[in-house]
Amino acid sequence: MSKMKMLPVQLSLNSLNPGIWSDVLWRCPPAPSSQLAELKTQLPPSLPSDPRLWSREDVLVFLRFCVREFDLPKLDFDLFQMNGKALCLLTRADFGHRCPGAGDVLHNVLQMLIIESHMMQWHLPNSPVTPTSRYPLSPHSHPPTPTWPPLNAPPENSPFHSSAHSLAGHHFMAPNSVTLSPPPSVDSQASSPPQAPYQNGGATGAAPGSAGGSAPAAGGATNTSNPTSSSASSTGSNGSQPNIMPMKGISSASSNHSDSEEEYSETSGGVSKMPPAPLSYSTASPPGTPILKDIKPNWTQQLTNSFVNSWSQQQQQQQQQQAAAVAAVAAQAQQHQLQQQQQQQQLPQKLTLDNTAGPVVTPAGGSISAPTTPSYMYKAKREFFPENSEPNTNGRLLWDFLQQLLNDRNQKYSDLIAWKCRDTGVFKIVDPAGLAKLWGIQKNHLSMNYDKMSRALRYYYRVNILRKVQGERHCYQFLRNPTELKNIKNISLLRQSTPANGNGGSPSMPQGSSQAPGSPAGQNWNPQQQSQQQQQSPQRPASRNGPMSLPAVAAVAAAAAAAYGPPPTSPLFMHAINGAFHYLSAAAAGPPPNSPALNTPSAVGGPDKFQFHPLKLENGSGSGSESAGEDLKPTDLSVSSKSTATSNEDCYPLIRNADGLTTIKLIRYNEHQVAASPAGQSPKHDDQQAGASNASSSPRPMDQASEQAQPVPMESDCNGGESEDSFRHMQQ
């Protein structure tokens, strides 16, 4: 690796061997010379540290300072109507022509300031410089930095300068670190060839040296792709070694540079981006800048010759590297494209799942990683999903994946999953292991099994997307329409929307042909749906005993009261009796008691027909019992003659869970019915209605037992032909 030439710095205190001079200077830089230190302290503070950033006013300030400081003859300031960039382009002869007798002094002072600014930026990129007007910390505090040649660029009077100084600006604006981009996806690999990151050695590369000596390279990774570019590090008092990584791979001489440039290298594989070099200084090491004490004339000529030679060699090497990089990138891209085409031809055949087949293996012996781009998965998607699947789903969610398998027009996956009742959304997983394997391929998770997939199914229980059908293995039911699920951005919002849907009631079913059990939508009861829901509903399983008529239930209750005495006034006892009453008479009633807001025709119902209203929970949330499991959802057993609950209705705040507690609304009769009741009862009534259609009034809570000793529960849908005396026997 070629050594980068460094400007010679003369040590005033030590006369060392020139061979080891650069190493000693690098490891322990001397203090700045007194002449330059005095010059820096005397300079006006308004002048930027880099003379190339000076404006016209700054140039005039500098000239006036030199005239005053060095007692020079008067200058013709009209000959220096230029900015700092143009002033730095003037040679010694130009200064001598414009101001005879003072041109050499002005040229030498200007060169000292230029070299000092170079040293600050090359050797101390991470030095904590005090933020002054000469060393601004913010890149926005001074004009934009022009593209300028580095130390190894030809000087201003060199013929190479006009055509190559913009290219060299990349080395001058070298950043200090390399930022790695995220791992490449299939999209980036398929659309663009792979590109290698810039190598950042652990220990830094070459150290700067004098014109006659060479700098030793510290231990570290050697970058063979660009011999002229090197890394440099300066060790401060804290021992840190900041890295300097010059940018390479410059393809054009334009001054408009992108924020990041990438180049392919054979020595590394990956993607990296070089951030733009900020004109700021971070805290890494204290400033210790080796500065020229004075410049000898013969050194100036040596520097010019070395700059020109190194620049020409660097340009040739960069052109060769660019040609090699372009050829390598083209070959790599062509090879990658061929591999991609082969994989596209082989993948659809292998993605067709066979239940008896082993793990899907690529020709190279590795596992298939499921494609993630639509263009890469286009053929395989036709094997998985129906052609009329809705956009923006792609089966990436489990419920959508199951829907697309179930709705396949050719029923190719009926041996894995099949509908049991499409109208109500009930389906069965025929082959759990095969379905989990197919889901693992879809999710690029080849170790997927049914136990892992069932976790997602159990999560769907909590958000009311699915529920498990009791009495049959691997049988589930959709509780929400796919269109509704696709319109929900965040699936966790389903927990919040559950109380608004009737507290446990489920919305419309897929296909929209029928309603789910417990649906809040108004729908006439059907005897077939009654028997079906008694088989499927986990909230109210059907009784295995034969149905009992209401008179028989009343007789059993009266016999129990006669045998064991009058029932106690405990609220828990009353609710246990009422819950048993409703549970035993569930088969005799028309609709199941867990169907809220069910509308029955007035022509069939008569005055004794009642309707459900939404359940009132103690905590006001419909998800209070969801954590207990799917069998612990609340059941609505309250009845009312109105379709919606009024504000003055009281409901016992109990939920039918595994404990057997239920929420029951108490009904009182009209005055002509209470007159026939036992004399021991004197219930307090609200405003009564004259019509027979309004058969209930506001209930009383259990803590007011003195006013209403034993309220009478009513079944949700009593037949008009049955006598009401059977209910009164329960009070005796």
Curated annotation (Swiss-Prot):
<dbReference type="GO" id="GO:0010629">
    <property type="term" value="P:negative regulation of gene expression"/>
</dbReference>
<dbReference type="GO" id="GO:0000981">
    <property type="term" value="F:DNA-binding transcription factor activity, RNA polymerase II-specific"/>
</dbReference>
<dbReference type="GO" id="GO:0045892">
    <property type="term" value="P:negative regulation of DNA-templated transcription"/>
</dbReference>
<feature type="region of interest" description="Disordered">
    <location>
        <begin position="674"/>
        <end position="732"/>
    </location>
</feature>
<feature type="modified residue" description="Phosphoserine">
    <location>
        <position position="682"/>
    </location>
</feature>
<dbReference type="GO" id="GO:0035157">
    <property type="term" value="P:negative regulation of fusion cell fate specification"/>
</dbReference>
<dbReference type="GO" id="GO:0005829">
    <property type="term" value="C:cytosol"/>
</dbReference>
<dbReference type="GO" id="GO:0007173">
    <property type="term" value="P:epidermal growth factor receptor signaling pathway"/>
</dbReference>
<dbReference type="GO" id="GO:0000978">
    <property type="term" value="F:RNA polymerase II cis-regulatory region sequence-specific DNA binding"/>
</dbReference>
<dbReference type="GO" id="GO:0010628">
    <property type="term" value="P:positive regulation of gene expression"/>
</dbReference>
<dbReference type="GO" id="GO:0060233">
    <property type="term" value="P:oenocyte delamination"/>
</dbReference>
<dbReference type="GO" id="GO:0090175">
    <property type="term" value="P:regulation of establishment of planar polarity"/>
</dbReference>
<comment type="similarity">
    <text>Belongs to the ETS family.</text>
</comment>
<feature type="compositionally biased region" description="Low complexity">
    <location>
        <begin position="205"/>
        <end position="240"/>
    </location>
</feature>
<feature type="region of interest" description="Disordered">
    <location>
        <begin position="133"/>
        <end position="295"/>
    </location>
</feature>
<dbReference type="GO" id="GO:0003677">
    <property type="term" value="F:DNA binding"/>
</dbReference>
<feature type="region of interest" description="Disordered">
    <location>
        <begin position="590"/>
        <end position="647"/>
    </location>
</feature>
<keyword id="KW-0805">Transcription regulation</keyword>
<dbReference type="GO" id="GO:1903688">
    <property type="term" value="P:positive regulation of border follicle cell migration"/>
</dbReference>
<dbReference type="GO" id="GO:0050767">
    <property type="term" value="P:regulation of neurogenesis"/>
</dbReference>
<dbReference type="InterPro" id="IPR000418">
    <property type="entry name" value="Ets_dom"/>
</dbReference>
<dbReference type="GO" id="GO:0035155">
    <property type="term" value="P:negative regulation of terminal cell fate specification, open tracheal system"/>
</dbReference>
<dbReference type="GO" id="GO:0001709">
    <property type="term" value="P:cell fate determination"/>
</dbReference>
<dbReference type="GO" id="GO:0007391">
    <property type="term" value="P:dorsal closure"/>
</dbReference>
<keyword id="KW-0678">Repressor</keyword>
<dbReference type="InterPro" id="IPR046328">
    <property type="entry name" value="ETS_fam"/>
</dbReference>
<dbReference type="GO" id="GO:0019904">
    <property type="term" value="F:protein domain specific binding"/>
</dbReference>
<dbReference type="InterPro" id="IPR036388">
    <property type="entry name" value="WH-like_DNA-bd_sf"/>
</dbReference>
<feature type="modified residue" description="Phosphoserine">
    <location>
        <position position="677"/>
    </location>
</feature>
<dbReference type="GO" id="GO:0006897">
    <property type="term" value="P:endocytosis"/>
</dbReference>
<feature type="modified residue" description="Phosphoserine">
    <location>
        <position position="696"/>
    </location>
</feature>
<dbReference type="GO" id="GO:0045500">
    <property type="term" value="P:sevenless signaling pathway"/>
</dbReference>
<dbReference type="GO" id="GO:0008406">
    <property type="term" value="P:gonad development"/>
</dbReference>
<feature type="compositionally biased region" description="Polar residues">
    <location>
        <begin position="637"/>
        <end position="647"/>
    </location>
</feature>
<protein>
    <recommendedName>
        <fullName>Ets DNA-binding protein pokkuri</fullName>
    </recommendedName>
</protein>
<comment type="function">
    <text>Ets-related protein that functions as a negative regulator of photoreceptor development acting antagonistically to pnt and the proneural signal mediated by RAS. It acts upstream of SINA to inhibit R7 development.</text>
</comment>
<dbReference type="Pfam" id="PF02198">
    <property type="entry name" value="SAM_PNT"/>
</dbReference>
<feature type="compositionally biased region" description="Pro residues">
    <location>
        <begin position="141"/>
        <end position="157"/>
    </location>
</feature>
<keyword id="KW-0238">DNA-binding</keyword>
<keyword id="KW-0539">Nucleus</keyword>
<dbReference type="InterPro" id="IPR036390">
    <property type="entry name" value="WH_DNA-bd_sf"/>
</dbReference>
<dbReference type="GO" id="GO:0110118">
    <property type="term" value="P:negative regulation of compound eye photoreceptor cell differentiation"/>
</dbReference>
